[in-house]
Structures are given as structure tokens and as C-alpha cells.
Amino acid sequence: MIENVSVCDLKMSKDLEEIENEIFTTAWPSETIKQKINNKEFKYWVYKKNDKLVAYLGVQFINDFIEILGIGVIEEYRKNGIAGELMNELLDFFNKSSYLKIILEVRESNDTAKNLYTKLGFNKISKRKNYYKNED
């Protein structure tokens, strides 16, 4: 079940922080997430399973494009198409919007994410050297 996080869902900021801490080496603190949820320039989609938050997708709106800030699925729910479902929600939103493009950053070693983005029609346009800490 996919839900849109809105201002009234600030209680989810702690859950989003926990998911980020589980998945990523550097995570946004819950206060930063709260600020983003309260800001119309950001949007979060969350995926719940049995009322448990198991995945999210966060974006920022910048001028005429959407930047994917993060997408994550907790380990026990991976390989079930959840990230793809969240991305399809974003693509549906994008197709109904006036935004011109979607951009994202992905770690060079993250083949799973790169495969998903390629499958969804994203193209590599450039590479930022030394963007990620501890890149392998």
C-alpha cells in the first residue's frame, strides 16, 4: 500500500529516519525530514506493509525538474518490486505535472538501483567524481 506523506504525517519522520539509517551510510536526521515534509518543495511517498513503513521515495522540486533525493526499501522487503512501485508512482505524478525532467544520483556500485532506473527509461548523463564517500 503506497501512501503520500503530507504535513499531517510528521510522526513518520522518525520512521523515515530509521529506514535511512538502516539502508544508507549517511542518513537525514528526523528534524531535517520534518522540515522537508513541511516544505512544498519536497514530497515523500511511503510504502507500508501491515501498517509498518518498509520503503520510501523522497523528491525535491527545483525549477522545472524533479530530483530524486532517496529511495529505500528495508532489507527483508527487497526484491519484491516495491522500489519499482514507488518509482511508478513518481512517474505517474511526473507525467501529470509540468516538470520537464527527473534527475537522480546513484552510487556507481549500486547495480540494483542502476538496473531499475535503466528499466524505467532513465539514461546516464554524467558522472560526478568523488561524490560519494567510500565509493568502491
Regions found by a protein language model. Give the residues of each.
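Conserved GNAT acetyl-CoA-binding A-motif
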Residues: 94-105
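Acyl-donor (CoA/ACP) binding surface of acyl/acetyltransferases
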Residues: 76-80, 84, 102, 128-129
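Structured catalytic core of nucleotide-sugar glycosyltransferases
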Residues: 93, 113, 125-127
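Acetyl-CoA-dependent GNAT
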Residues: 4-5, 10-76, 87-89, 93, ...
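Short glycine/proline-centered loop/turn elements that form peptide/ligand docking sites
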Residues: 83, 87, 109-113, 130-135
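Conserved active-site tyrosine of GNAT-family acetyltransferases
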Residues: 117, 122
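Conserved catalytic-core motifs of GNAT/GCN5-like acyltransferases
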Residues: 105, 123-136
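A short, internal acetyl-CoA/4′-phosphopantetheine-binding micro-motif in the GNAT/acyltransferase core
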Residues: 71-79, 106-109
